[in-house]
């Protein structure tokens, strides 16, 4: 039987909020079977819990944000969720003392390290996978995203930026998912942005915590970060990282192929909602044997380092 997973121990870190620029403390705690991922705002009295569900994603400008019916929000969840998805964590309580998850270095790698430091605990209930039975597609102008049946989890992603540095890099990638491939090839890819946008963002109280410490920054011609890129194709890899996180609000690891062109947080969430709404397009499945599961996660205790 392939079992659900949580973290073995509580683990905590502190970072900066990308949009607020303020210090944020993040705590990850174990959770019982069938809890899912629950985020909690501990700076509010009483604390407010927000379950990580597709219909709770109500803001997708510059990041993915969960917002409850009372307007309480937790923003910038996508990199943490990519790490949770990449390591196959089904159940956890995520406490944060601010309206956003800390940006850390702009990638999922610090969250992978945090989860591996906490340890991964198998639980007593079977892990449920969301298996795609028919293709579901969403479009917005020339942008599109779809998910189709596939015996595994594959990502086929293309970006198209009219920028000389990005144009020089590979802008299309196909990846068959495994925990090892995610940690080594995707998790360290950082978010990126353009100098020309920063003034506008800061005038709107966004990206106040953004810097070359937590993003790849480009001017009109080149990457400005002194150390350059972590991967030659870091741009498309970061978009794949974002997609991993955005898709995980489906509540389960996906068995299918995610194909996308120029998609972002908004279209990713639209796709998840469209899939869940089309009840004939998917089914929940479990597996008795590791060898039978088409999606592979590293075994607990076997840390995979980038």
Swiss-Prot record:
It is an enzyme of class 3 (hydrolase). Gene3D superfamilies: lpxc deacetylase, domain 1 (3.30.230.20), lpxc deacetylase, domain 2 (3.30.1700.10). GO terms for cellular component: membrane. Transmembrane segments: none annotated. Keywords: Hydrolase, Lipid A biosynthesis, Lipid biosynthesis, Lipid metabolism, Metal-binding, Zinc. GO terms for biological process: lipid A biosynthetic process. Its EC number is 3.5.1.108. Pathway: Glycolipid biosynthesis; lipid IV(A) biosynthesis; lipid IV(A) from (3R)-3-hydroxytetradecanoyl-[acyl-carrier-protein] and UDP-N-acetyl-alpha-D-glucosamine: step 2/6. Zn(2+) binds at residues 79, 238, 242. It comes from the Bacteria. It catalyses: a UDP-3-O-[(3R)-3-hydroxyacyl]-N-acetyl-alpha-D-glucosamine + H2O = a UDP-3-O-[(3R)-3-hydroxyacyl]-alpha-D-glucosamine + acetate. The keyword Lipid metabolism applies. Its cofactor is Zn(2+). GO terms for molecular function: metal ion binding; UDP-3-O-acyl-N-acetylglucosamine deacetylase activity. The active site is at residue 265. InterPro entries: Ribosomal_Su5_D2-typ_SF (IPR020568), UDP-acyl_GlcNac_deAcase (IPR004463), UDP-acyl_GlcNac_deAcase_C (IPR011334), UDP-acyl_N-AcGlcN_deAcase_N (IPR015870). The keyword Zinc applies. SUPFAM superfamilies: Ribosomal protein S5 domain 2-like (SSF54211). Belongs to the LpxC family. NCBIfam families: lpxC. Catalyzes the hydrolysis of UDP-3-O-myristoyl-N-acetylglucosamine to form UDP-3-O-myristoylglucosamine and acetate, the committed step in lipid A biosynthesis. This is UDP-3-O-acyl-N-acetylglucosamine deacetylase. It comes from Shewanella amazonensis (strain ATCC BAA-1098 / SB2B). The gene is lpxC.
């Amino acid at each position: 039987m392939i079992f659900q997973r949580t973290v073995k121990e509580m683990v905590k870190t502190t970072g900066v909020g990308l949009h607020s620029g303020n210090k944020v403390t993040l705590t990850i705690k174990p959770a019982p079977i069938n809890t899912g991922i629950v985020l909690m705002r501990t700076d509010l009295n009483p604390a407010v819990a927000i379950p990580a569900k597709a219909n709770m994603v109500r803001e997708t400008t510059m990041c993915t944000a969960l917002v409850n019916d009372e307007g309480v929000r937790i923003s910038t969840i996508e990199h943490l969720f990519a790490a949770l998805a990449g390591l196959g964590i089904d159940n956890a309580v995520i406490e944060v003392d601010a309206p956003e998850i800390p940006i850390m270095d702009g990638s999922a790698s610090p969250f992978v390290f945090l989860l591996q430091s906490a340890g991964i605990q198998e639980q007593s209930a079977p892990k449920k996978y969301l298996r795609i039975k028919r293709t579901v597609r969403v479009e917005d102008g020339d942008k599109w995203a779809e998910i189709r049946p596939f015996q595994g989890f594959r990502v086929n992603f293309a970006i198209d930026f009219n920028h000389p540095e990005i144009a020089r890099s590979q802008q299309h990638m196909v990846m068959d998912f495994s925990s090892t491939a995610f940690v080594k090839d995707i998790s360290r890819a950082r978010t990126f942005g353009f100098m020309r946008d920063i003034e506008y963002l800061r005038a709107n109280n966004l990206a106040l915590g953004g810097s070359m410490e937590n993003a790849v920054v480009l001017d009109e011609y080149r990457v400005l970060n002194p150390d350059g890129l972590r991967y030659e194709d870091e741009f498309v890899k970061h978009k794949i990282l974002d997609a991993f996180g955005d898709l995980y609000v489906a509540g389960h690891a996906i068995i299918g192929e995610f194909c996308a062109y120029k998609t972002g947080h908004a279209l990713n969430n639209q796709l998840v909602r469209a899939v869940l709404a089309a009840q004939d397009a998917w089914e929940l499945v479990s597996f008795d044997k590791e060898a039978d599961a088409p999606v592979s996660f590293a075994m607990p205790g076997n840390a995979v380092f980038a």
